[in-house]
């Protein structure tokens, strides 16, 4: 019986070489070699792994196992373990490793034994929690089903949507726990609580006048519907908007809760939470993106030879996995085809395509400029004429005037991406790059549209004439301007949700019915619509940016966004399965996931700008809100610091001073440059090692060719066989 396995027959040249002493064998004097050298040999590990089928191997190698076991179990002077060779790296069976572990425990001290036991218990508990959380993951089965039917690119969109649902839910928990709940409890005197309201000092009386247009007396039903859509009327005086939180402090028995400070710190908290979570997920996806893009040939090998999960026992799961691998291979082949096409372009073709791209980008800039100007004019018209419509009590006209900015923004968000999607077909990019470029262009449309809207509002809120000097803002048009901004964000969020539902019900499903039951050539040429990943991603990134900006002005906006995205998931899933078709050009999920998060991070960074301006520069409303006694919302921070002890005040002011900030910035830059240089050095070392591996593999192939030629020419293969056997069994530590 051979040590290569039961019933395995060795080739004749190996048997002949063994009889002549030209072949390395475990039963020879080499067994006395050091254990470390023998354990590096792949033949040694293979033989031990198969010792259950080859009983004579255990006897031949028993002395070597004894040496290794003795070295492993040898007690140390401090009573600890011998940590030179980790137990899991030894080529022993589970029973032998367990015996070795028990021997280590026998010689270990009580402290080491407790530390080992607690560490194992903690790791096991973490593993169980991780497995349980994976089974309890939201929409786990639905997303796996989508991945199998439509590929990993579309699956990445639904995973991204799930992430936003969880993020908004955590934002809602923060705002509700630290802002809404204390305000409601103190206003209603629950749990022996009370609230304190201090009238603003050194403020003109007319600046403190705020009479919300709440519904009083008998009103028509459509009035409630209008208020529900616009955030005015009965909604304006609820916990949904900034104006409700007109509290300076909440008292719970003898404990004072500083609501203005909590309001500001919670705003910073949800922004920091979003930033850290997005960065964490971006790093994970970027690492996977680098691995997938490192070597396409290696990716093919991994998918073909190691892509299948042999733990799958369900037939449906097997079909989904099969389709997922098929889409991934199609994506790789499509990328290789495009790379080959780009490499074969002539100079004339390159000049043509570059000229066409420049012309298309000029058209894109013109479309963007038209969108921005339309939004600015619509916002100014809406703010100037909404009060006129209210006085005339014309319900439809008032609703249209108030929703005019939202209608124009949504129209621009719908028309501009359609133009960009049509133009990008002529630019001849890859499927993945088409999505990225379309996303970037649509980001400028959607997010810049929100910026133009806010700029239009602030240009009217913060005016420079004599009317605004007394209060710092236009108190006649905006007595509580924070609630007005919150209402605009609320209308954008609601209107965007209504458009998504309307497009699914009145465009996607009728198109599906026409294509299915109408045999006209024009209808069949029109066909089913593909699931546009870039458009759908921009929809939710646009809504999330609105939520980040509007949460400061409407603390419960994350709850609305959570419900909105939860419903959108099922709407998009039903639309995808019943009315859409898979993309004709598959895309890679790893690059999509990373780029989606990168665009979302851009939206978050852009949200910092209007929030920073509102908190630090624009005067806070004197008639409503927790900051009515301060010039700006940020003024609560230095006011709170003045209540600290003198030593702590000096320390905080020292940290905020330029004397500390400049050296800290320089040191941070030095550390950043150091880690960048270190990463570059590691990358160069990895490239050198990869080149070395490729060179060694070529050398070995060259040697094999030479040995084959020597065998054919000499007719005496014994010497070649000797060289071959010694080369095959040399240590692989160089590789």
UniProtKB/Swiss-Prot annotation:
Keywords: Glycoprotein, Membrane, Transmembrane, Transmembrane helix. The gene is Tmc7. It is found in: Membrane. The chain crosses the membrane at residues 165-185, 234-254, 259-279, 356-376, 404-424, 437-457, 489-509, 549-569, 595-615, 635-655, 659-679. Residues 186-233, 280-355, 425-436, 510-548, 616-634, 680-735 are cytoplasmic. Its main location: membrane. Glycans are attached at residue 385. InterPro entries: TMC, TMC_dom. Signal peptide: none annotated. One of its GO terms (biological process) is sensory perception of mechanical stimulus. It is a multi-pass membrane protein. Residues 710-735 are annotated as: Disordered. Residues 1-164, 255-258, 377-403, 458-488, 570-594, 656-658 are extracellular. Belongs to the TMC family. Probable component of an ion channel. The lineage of its organism: Eukaryota, Metazoa, Chordata, Craniata, Vertebrata. GO terms for cellular component: plasma membrane. This is Transmembrane channel-like protein 7. One of its GO terms (molecular function) is mechanosensitive monoatomic ion channel activity. The keyword Metal-binding does not apply. The keyword ATP-binding does not apply. PANTHER family: TRANSMEMBRANE CHANNEL-LIKE PROTEIN 7, TRANSMEMBRANE CHANNEL-RELATED.
């Amino acid at each position: 019986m051979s040590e290569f396995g039961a019933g395995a027959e060795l080739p004749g040249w190996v048997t002949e070489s063994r009889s002549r002493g030209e072949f390395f064998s475990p039963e020879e004097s080499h067994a006395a070699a050091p254990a470390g050298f023998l354990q590096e040999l792949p033949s040694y590990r293979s033989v031990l792994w198969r010792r259950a089928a080859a009983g004579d191997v255990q006897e031949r190698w028993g002395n070597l196992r004894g040496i290794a076991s003795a070295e492993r179990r040898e007690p140390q002077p401090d009573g600890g373990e011998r940590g030179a060779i980790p137990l899991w790296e030894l080529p022993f069976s589970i029973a032998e490793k367990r015996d070795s572990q028990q021997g280590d425990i026998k010689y270990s001290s009580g402290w080491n034994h407790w530390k080992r036991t607690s560490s194992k218990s903690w790791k096991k508990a973490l593993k169980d929690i991780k497995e349980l959380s994976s089974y309890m993951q939201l929409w786990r089965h639905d997303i796996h089903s989508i991945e199998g039917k439509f590929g990993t690119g579309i699956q990445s969109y639904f995973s991204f949507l799930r992430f936003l649902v969880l993020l908004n839910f955590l934002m809602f928990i923060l705002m509700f726990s630290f802002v809404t709940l204390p305000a409601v409890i103190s206003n209603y005197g629950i749990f022996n609580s009370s609230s304190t309201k201090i009238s603003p000092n050194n403020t003109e009386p007319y600046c403190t006048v705020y009479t919300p247009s709440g519904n009083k007396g008998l009103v028509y039903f459509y009035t409630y519907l209008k208020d529900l859509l616009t955030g005015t009327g009965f909604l304006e005086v609820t916990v949904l908007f900034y104006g409700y939180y007109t509290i300076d402090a909440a008292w719970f028995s003898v404990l004072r809760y500083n609501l203005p400070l909590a309001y500001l710190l919670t705003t910073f908290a949800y922004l920091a939470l979003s930033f850290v979570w997005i960065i964490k997920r971006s790093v994970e996806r970027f690492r996977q993106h680098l691995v997938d893009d490192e070597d396409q040939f290696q990716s093919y090998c991994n998918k073909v030879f190691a892509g299948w999960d042999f733990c799958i026992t369900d037939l449906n799961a097997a079909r989904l996995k099969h389709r997922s691998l098929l889409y991934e291979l199609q994506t790789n082949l499509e990328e290789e085809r495009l790379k080959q096409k780009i490499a074969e372009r002539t100079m004339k073709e390159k000049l043509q395509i570059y000229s066409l791209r420049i012309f298309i980008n000029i058209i894109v800039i013109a479309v963007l400029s038209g969108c921005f100007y339309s939004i600015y004019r619509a916002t100014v018209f809406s703010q100037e004429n909404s009060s006129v419509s209210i006085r005339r009590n014309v319900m439809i006209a008032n609703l249209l005037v108030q929703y005019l900015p939202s209608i124009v923004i949504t129209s621009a968000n719908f028309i501009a991406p359609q133009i960009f999607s049509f133009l990008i077909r002529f630019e001849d990019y890859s499927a993945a790059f088409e999505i990225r470029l379309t996303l970037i262009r649509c980001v400028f449309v959607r997010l810049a549209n929100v910026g133009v809207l806010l700029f239009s509002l602030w240009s009217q809120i913060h005016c420079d004439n004599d009317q605004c000097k007394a209060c710092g803002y236009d108190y006649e048009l905006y007595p509580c301007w924070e609630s007005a901004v919150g209402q605009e964000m609320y209308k954008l969020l609601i209107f965007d949700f209504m458009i998504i539902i309307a497009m699914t019900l009145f465009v996607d499903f009728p198109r599906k019915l026409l294509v299915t039951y109408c045999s006209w050539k024009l209808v069949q040429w029109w066909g089913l619509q593909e699931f546009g990943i870039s458009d759908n991603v921009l929809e939710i990134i646009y809504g999330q940016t609105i939520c980040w900006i509007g949460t400061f002005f409407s603390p419960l906006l994350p709850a609305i966004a959570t419900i909105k995205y939860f419903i959108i998931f099922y709407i998009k899933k039903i639309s995808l399965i019943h009315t859409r078709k898979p993309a004709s050009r598959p895309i890679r999920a790893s690059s999509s996931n990373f780029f989606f998060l990168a665009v979302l991070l851009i939206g978050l960074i852009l949200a910092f700008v209007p929030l920073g301006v509102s908190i630090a520069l624009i005067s806070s409303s004197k008639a409503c809100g927790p900051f009515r006694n301060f010039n700006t919302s940020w003024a609560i921070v230095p006011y709170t610091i003045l209540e600290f002890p003198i030593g702590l005040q000096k320390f905080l002011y020292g940290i905020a001073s330029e004397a500390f900030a400049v050296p800290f910035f320089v040191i941070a830059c030095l550390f950043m440059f150091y880690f960048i240089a270190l990463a570059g050095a590691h990358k160069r070392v990895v490239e050198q090692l990869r080149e070395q591996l490729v060179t060694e593999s070529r050398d070995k192939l060259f040697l094999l060719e030479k040995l084959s030629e020597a065998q054919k020419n000499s007719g005496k293969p014994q010497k070649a066989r000797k060289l071959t056997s010694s080369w095959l069994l040399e240590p692989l530590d160089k590789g």
